Amino acid sequence: MRLLKTAFHPDISPADLFPEEILQEGLCPASNLKLIERHAARGIVVKGENILLLFTQRYHDYSLPGGGIDEGEDEIEGLIRELKEETGAAGVRNVKPFARYDEYRPWYKPDADVIHMISHCYTCEIDDELGDTAYESHEVSNGMKPVWMNIHVAIAHNEEVIANSEKKGLSIERETFMLKVIAAELVADMKREA
């Protein structure tokens, strides 16, 4: 899967990280920071210029559905589970790898100092009807809900949130970056084919 971008939180220096050594040792060699790696699967479901997204009221942003891959799952199994839980999607099919997005950010739990988040993004199709969701408690309290949204409207909305927010979160930057790539590559291709 092609790597689109590697993003670093402002508190993490790229000079401190050497991925080949990190993966073998579990340490960031220049700083002795403890690093953990987490894999996520994210779904890209596009119909014309509309895309299936999650709107989160707490952060007032749009994001791709998906999340962490559970132990024992492969990426596709994690993708299908996350789409079902977060959007109620059924009949997930025609799954194809699209791109990967890597992030290094501080980790605030005692088991590590830095998390290397690897987001595996897949295009897919789903049944037209969305069923019931199965949100985790924090997703409910954050006001998460699935929406079909014009991709260009979602990009403009997220850009406005970034421009007007003092917090510069890596998550919204990742989501907006991915939406722009999807719009440029997938939505533009669909228009040319039509």
What role is predicted for each listed range?
Residues 1-42, 48:
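Acidic, metal-coordinating catalytic segment for phosphate/diphosphate chemistry
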Residues 35-37, 111-118, 138-143:
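A generic structural micro-feature
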Residues 103-133, 147:
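Active-site-adjacent beta-strand/loop module that shapes the phosphate/pyrophosphate-binding cleft
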Residues 48-50, 125-130, 151-153:
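Short loop segments at secondary-structure junctions
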Residues 131-194:
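Nudix hydrolase/Nudix homology domain
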Residues 35, 61-62, 103-106:
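Short, solvent-exposed loop/turn segments at secondary-structure junctions
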Residues 90-100:
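A short coil-to-beta-strand element that immediately follows conserved catalytic motifs
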Residues 46-89:
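Conserved Nudix-box catalytic region and its N-terminal flanking loop in Nudix hydrolases
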